[in-house]
Amino acid sequence: IGREAIVGAGLQGPFGGPWPYDALSPFDMPYGPALPAMSCGAGSFGPSSGFAPAAAYGGGLAVTSSSPISPTGLSVTSENTIEGVVAVTGQLPFLGAVVTDGIFPTVGAGDVWYGCGDGAVGIVAETPFASTSVNPAYGYGGAIGGGVPYNSYGPIGYGGCGYNALY
């Protein structure tokens, strides 16, 4: 879920800066003080992707799944009027068919690119995440509580998610 679905389009973290979330992998590199190799990608000062791919800034995408017996599939629905050049990026796992429905003007094109390999099946056309920047971690202090440290780790709080010493 992009930050737009949580706080609205174009808004950043609770205190103005992008949230320090590393969308690459939770185990990719050490930059958290508690468990350096398992810092959940949100260490004291870690790479920040801004929580969403660059193409997700148009708002949240509704995802629904339903079945009369049990959930057996995923349906992604977006009912928008789109004008101009459009690029949709990301990876959507699927087995079976992909359907694009709607009116395509006589000028332009509508395509679905997909592929599979190494056990992964999904839509594979992607763009890079937003530019990486360095931002402080979550945690109480500084802006909340008048600078009172959280878990005795200073005014910006404990590196990572702030859950005791686990991460």
UniProtKB/Swiss-Prot annotation:
Belongs to the chorion protein family. Residues 1-55 are annotated as: Left arm. Keywords: Repeat. The keyword Repeat applies. Residues 56-126 are annotated as: Central domain. This protein is one of many from the eggshell of the silk moth. It comes from the Eukaryota. It holds the Pfam family Chorion_1. One of its GO terms (cellular component) is egg chorion. Residues 127-167 are annotated as: Right arm. This is Chorion class CB protein PC404. The keyword Electron transport does not apply. The lineage of its organism: Eukaryota, Metazoa, Ecdysozoa, Arthropoda, Hexapoda.
